[in-house]
Amino acid sequence: MAHITRFETPWFLVISKKQYKWTVRPNAGPHPIEKSIPLAVVIRDYLKLAETVREAKHIIFDGKVLVDGKVRKDYKYPVGLMDIVSIPSADLYFRVIPDNVRFMRLSKISADEAHYKYVRIMNKTTVKGGSIQLNLEDGRNILVDKETAKSFKTLMTLKIELPSQNIVDSFIISEGSYAIFVGGKNVGIHGVVKNINLSKFKSRKYSVITLESKDGNTYQTNLMNVMSIGREKSDMRVD
């Protein structure tokens, strides 16, 4: 189905449900449909660079829009958390970050910042030849040797260069590190990790993380909803 009614769209999409009956349905891709924004909606409703889907299509089909450093000409391409949306011809660069009100929002960044993406390791697998494949949250994979793989843990965040995928840095959730909630009722809250309560009877992903925001309030959620984005302070722009 190419389109869905606006009333069937995810609650967080920034679109007017009274203006038109139909809107764009995102294609299958690196992010779940229920957690993604169609590229045409990003251009029209989030960035206000077009008034209609047709106008947004022209911008996209002209090859002016990049997602994670690659030109995307699919107007239904699913854009999700931590993706980099770039329009170099207009000197516009954005990172999709968690938001406590609308789940996701586009944060304006510099051209230099747009060269880097933050993405979590969801699991690791051994491939033919003995190399280890790091399977990342946005569907991409990175091959490393066995020795290097030992330093990478599940749910660790990688800072990768775009579009090469070279690993520039990595961040693990630990007490004193900086993190942001990417799921749960407090999505978008960020601050310093104060405590990690490891689950005794369930897998590590159910560990409870306590985070203290810059206003001094504390919040808790399970590890699956937390993304490390720095050591003592955030490595990326979050405000």
From Swiss-Prot:
GO-annotated cellular components: cytosolic small ribosomal subunit
Listed PROSITE patterns: S4
S4 RNA-binding domain location: 37-99
One GO term of the biological process aspect: translation
CDD domains on file: KOW_RPS4, S4
S-S bonds: none
Domain of life: Archaea
Pfam families per record: Ribosomal_S4e, S4
Entry keywords, A to Z: Ribonucleoprotein, Ribosomal protein, RNA-binding, rRNA-binding
SMART domains: S4
GO MF: rRNA binding; structural constituent of ribosome
The family this protein is said to belong to: Belongs to the eukaryotic ribosomal protein eS4 family.
PANTHER family attached to this UniProt entry: 30S/40S RIBOSOMAL PROTEIN S4, SMALL RIBOSOMAL SUBUNIT PROTEIN ES4
Name of the protein this chain belongs to: Small ribosomal subunit protein eS4
Designated gene of the protein: rps4e
